[in-house]
Amino acid sequence: MSVVGLDVGSQSCYIAVARAGGIETIANEFSDRCTPSVISFGSKNRTIGVAAKNQQITHANNTVSNFKRFHGRAFNDPFIQKEKENLSYDLVPLKNGGVGIKVMYMGEEHLFSVEQITAMLLTKLKETAENSLKKPVTDCVISVPSFFTDAERRSVLDAAQIVGLNCLRLMNDMTAVALNYGIYKQDLPSLDEKPRIVVFVDMGHSAFQVSACAFNKGKLKVLGTAFDPFLGGKNFDEKLVEHFCAEFKTKYKLDAKSKIRALLRLYQECEKLKKLMSSNSTDLPLNIECFMNDKDVSGKMNRSQFEELCAELLQKIEVPLYSLLEQTHLKVEDVSAVEIVGGATRIPAVKERIAKFFGKDISTTLNADEAVARGCALQCAILSPAFKVREFSVTDAVPFPISLIWNHDSEDTEGVHEVFSRNHAAPFSKVLTFLRRGPFELEAFYSDPQGVPYPEAKIGRFVVQNVSAQKDGEKSRVKVKVRVNTHGIFTISTASMVEKVPTEENEMSSEADMECLNQRPPENPDTDKNVQQDNSEAGTQPQVQTDAQQTSQSPPSPELTSEENKIPDADKANEKKVDQPPEAKKPKIKVVNVELPIEANLVWQLGKDLLNMYIETEGKMIMQDKLEKERNDAKNAVEEYVYEFRDKLCGPYEKFICEQDHQNFLRLLTETEDWLYEEGEDQAKQAYVDKLEELMKIGTPVKVRFQEAEERPKMFEELGQRLQHYAKIAADFRNKDEKYNHIDESEMKKVEKSVNEVMEWMNNVMNAQAKKSLDQDPVVRAQEIKTKIKELNNTCEPVVTQPKPKIESPKLERTPNGPNIDKKEEDLEDKNNFGAEPPHQNGECYPNEKNSVNMDLD
């Protein structure tokens, strides 16, 4: 079972896997642990990652990058319209109103959704992980920014489903970093002590995120998060690009923005310059050859100029930091440490601003690039039964407050209730009770639209169906369970209607009593169990009680308040119903919970038909990529064979082919090379396979003759040594050598016979081989000689290595007063005289042992 964590960023991705030795960040086929989030489309296949980034300038219109923020957004979204101006590829609306990416693929114009593009990137990451782990990858944990809304998270899950990944959890970036930080800490305070507060700051390529986390031993709780979704390393690059565009326009009369390739080159050079300025404060040059119109351009900048240029961006850093402290009611003095991650935090001015705000040195103990991926892998290991991980509970926070709105039964007024406040513990479930006579709708939305970086505050509309009044005409109690799950997605998971069924008194047996008791708890204890179960995971049980108290005391919605007040009193009401009938002698009431279907109409969710179509399309593209790779491998094999033999035919292989064949083969190699770059440039795989077989028919015998000429003498030498060895042993046997006088003569004759036969065979083949020229096929191959050596050893070695039989010395009879043989016997006799009973060795004893002193020899 695979355990993989995927950090899917706007600019690059990282893959971390859990192994027996711990968490490891793995490298791709270019031995780079960083895989660019870039997909390039060609006439035959797709290229993803490093290879795609290398084509970004030459194939700008068909290379897609910086698409992460397009998830779950409509084409008319203001953010999409703004970003569209800076992209090298085209964005168009899809039929469902989403963002479509138009590219040329396989010689045709294609429209891909953002989910499909992300699925392509995940395909590459999955392939890289499988190549490293040597087994299929299915389960994983994927990171998302903490400010991603419900629609954006659902879109990422759809992308994972397209590629066949089972995403166990969508994990917030900052939560993953906190887990990676806390699980290895051995000095955390115990559960009954005050938690340690650590602030994590992450500035990546496109966003700035901060979070405050409370740590106890084996426990992590996210207290709050804050962010600026539009502040990242990309914005600093844009400042440099704007500066040099203006400079080049004045200095060289060149408008870099008029040509996308020139602009992309300038972006790449400005990014390099930004990184260099992080470690150098002196003036640094920027030089680009043949920038536009065959003109070379140059410029320079130092760190102080860069900081002055980005002063507006640097001022924005403090805004999320203030917001975080305000949300969590923390003071700067409460923060024990400040950890920074993310590539853009390497900018010295960014570090200085953060350190100045908190009034303490910032810590860089975590890997700035890989911390998120490692945290995701740890979370995946915790969720996986295949790994045993130290117990560590993770409680996340809801980034935006979520409310429900509904229409009152038989009334036009609407009821509103905030079910999850900002920074509420997650995952978490709550149960609401409604009094209804028929089906009703609930609409979920974000309570604070201004604080959500998404134009649509609505989450979805949920219709609770099959609701009916009680048989006596009273309203039915409908219990609705709302939940923010492990992915941070809001959902109405279940709905049930409490139905009262009257029963006859004579039918109320003891079994019915038990049934009544068993049916009643789902009304209240089941609710408590669900909430408590989630609370126990989240570790915030008192918060639910507080929320219930606040809800019961708040006057905005009388209907909901009265209903929620009924939940704690349900047991009392039921007790009255159970206790009263015997007094009044009325029919017994049995309470039954009826599950109700829920129809969900979400702001963003791919339909099953569309999702299946995307899965099928991705499968076809994966197969096409595989076929194209095999075709290219076959073509490269032909090209490699041509170059290899052309060099060796004029070198080591020259003696092993006759002159006429030599000239013909060289001519064929040249013709093949010309064919590869002309009509063979774009052929089917089988054409290259056939061409390689044609070359190998001539080249393989030459290569074999060369290899045989290298190996054959070594094998003959080894065979000669073995023959000489066994022949000498046979001669020593004939000369009555004591070493071999124990060997039977008939067996030694077998050795002599085998030696003579093999020696005769060797002489014959050596004489025959000597008559052959090097350009002719050998009489005998090295493998045949090796087989003869093995046969000779199998025949002779068991005979000549027979051990001599052991000669036993005669046993001497002992008399009671006989002399001692050696000191060891004397020691044993002394021990026996002191009353020690000697042990018998191997069950042997001397014939007169019973009549003599007890004595034994070791």
Curated annotation (Swiss-Prot):
The keyword Phosphoprotein applies. Keywords: Acetylation, ATP-binding, Cytoplasm, Nucleotide-binding, Phosphoprotein, Stress response. One of its GO terms (biological process) is response to unfolded protein. It comes from Homo sapiens. Residues 500-584, 796-858 are annotated as: Disordered. Residues 504-514 have a biased composition (Acidic residues). The modification N-acetylserine is found at residue 2. Acts as a nucleotide-exchange factor (NEF) for chaperone proteins HSPA1A and HSPA1B, promoting the release of ADP from HSPA1A/B thereby triggering client/substrate protein release. Prevents the aggregation of denatured proteins in cells under severe stress, on which the ATP levels decrease markedly. Inhibits HSPA8/HSC70 ATPase and chaperone activities. Phosphorylation on Ser-509 may be important for regulation of the HSPA8/HSC70 chaperone activity. GO terms for cellular component: cytoplasm; cytosol; endocytic vesicle lumen; extracellular exosome; extracellular region; microtubule; nucleoplasm; nucleus. It is found in: Cytoplasm. Belongs to the heat shock protein 70 family. This is Heat shock protein 105 kDa.
